[in-house]
Amino acid sequence: MPKINGNEIRPGNVLEHNGGLWAAVKVDHVKPGKGGAFAQVELRNLRNGSKLNERFRSADKVERVRLEQKDQQFLYESDGMLVFMDAETYEQIELPAELLGERRPFLQDGMTIVVEFHDDEALNASLPQKVVCKVVETEPVVKGQTAANSFKPAILDNGVKVMVPPFVGQDEDIVVNTETMDYSERA
């Protein structure tokens, strides 16, 4: 595994630090008036989700880990476990539903997601950035209410509540960004 300097850490990098695997969530490069420059890095443990703030000087060496990414197709859920099938080998694997966190409701039957592995252990899963959902409940459209840039609450077919523009009505399909959990556009 390659070692990188502390000032080369970027958001999204996976590092081996303090005996665990950590994902760099946020990186701030700081150059104080006195003393050497350093990177203030917010890390998230890939195994248990705990967070840690660390300071890395430019001279510090950190082990960067490359994760293997595989496409997995969602099949079904059983006892809090999500069952996926590898798109290439047709091998089935079970992953805990907590791996997706608050994005879990956006997982749909047959959807292909990217799962990141390290030594055959699934550490992270990412949904497609945009997903089509149906609005099942929202306030009716009121004419003339488009003057201000306002939004109204809507409940989607998966139970998630998002804010939508006033022109979106009930039973309409919309596109939702799964990373921010916000309305993107009409489908």
From Swiss-Prot:
InterPro entries associated with the record: Elong-fact-P_C, NA-bd_OB-fold, Rib_uL2_dom2, Transl_elong_fac_P/YeiP, Transl_elong_KOW-like, Transl_elong_P/YeiP_cen, Transl_elong_P/YeiP_CS, Transl_elongation_fac_P
UniProt xrefs under Pfam families: EFP (PF01132), EFP_N (PF08207), Elong-fact-P_C (PF09285)
Pathway(s) annotated for this protein in UniProt: Protein biosynthesis; polypeptide chain elongation
UniProt entry keywords in alphabetical sequence: Cytoplasm, Elongation factor, Protein biosynthesis
Record GO terms (molecular function): translation elongation factor activity
Record-level GO BP terms: peptide biosynthetic process
Compartment annotation: Cytoplasm
SMART domains per the UniProt record, alphabetical: EFP (SM01185), Elong-fact-P_C (SM00841)
Sections of the chain in a coiled coil: none
Alphabetized PROSITE patterns for the sequence: EFP (PS01275)
Domain of life according to the entry: Bacteria
GO cellular component: cytoplasm
NCBIfam families, per database record: efp, PRK00529.1
Role according to the record: Involved in peptide bond synthesis. Stimulates efficient translation and peptide-bond synthesis on native or reconstituted 70S ribosomes in vitro. Probably functions indirectly by altering the affinity of the ribosome for aminoacyl-tRNA, thus increasing their reactivity as acceptors for peptidyl transferase.
Family, per entry: Belongs to the elongation factor P family.
Protein name in the entry: Elongation factor P
Organism: Jannaschia sp. (strain CCS1)
Lineage: Bacteria, Pseudomonadati, Pseudomonadota, Alphaproteobacteria, Rhodobacterales
Gene: efp
